[in-house]
Amino acid sequence: MALLDFFLSRKKQTANIAKERLQIIVAERRRGDSEPPYLPDLKRDILAVICKYIQIDPEMLHVQFEQKGDDISVLELNVTLPESEEVTK
């Protein structure tokens, strides 16, 4: 019976993981309509410049683009710096 429980519980976990991934994809597509196509490249380049000086995880960099009206665009950049600054020069 334990073997059966193992396989059944795994399906529930797999379903939850798939559901979360699908929600992320849907949210990205909704948000992606207003983003310029160069934003992923810009984020990658900004991360590369920051990594020249401080070693950070890519998850510590958040870039958000917001359109306010027809002629105003806001690019918000949040970088979480590590507590111990590891200089990589």
Curated annotation (Swiss-Prot):
InterPro entries per record: MinE (IPR005527), MinE_sf (IPR036707)
Keywords from the UniProt entry: Cell cycle, Cell division
Mention any Pfam family matching this sequence: MinE
List the GO biological process terms. cell division; regulation of division septum assembly
Recorded coiled-coil stretches: none
Q: Which family does it belong to?
A: Belongs to the MinE family.
Say what the protein does.
Prevents the cell division inhibition by proteins MinC and MinD at internal division sites while permitting inhibition at polar sites. This ensures cell division at the proper site by restricting the formation of a division septum at the midpoint of the long axis of the cell.
NCBIfam families on file? minE, PRK00296.1
Protein name per the record: Cell division topological specificity factor
Organism of origin? Serratia proteamaculans (strain 568)
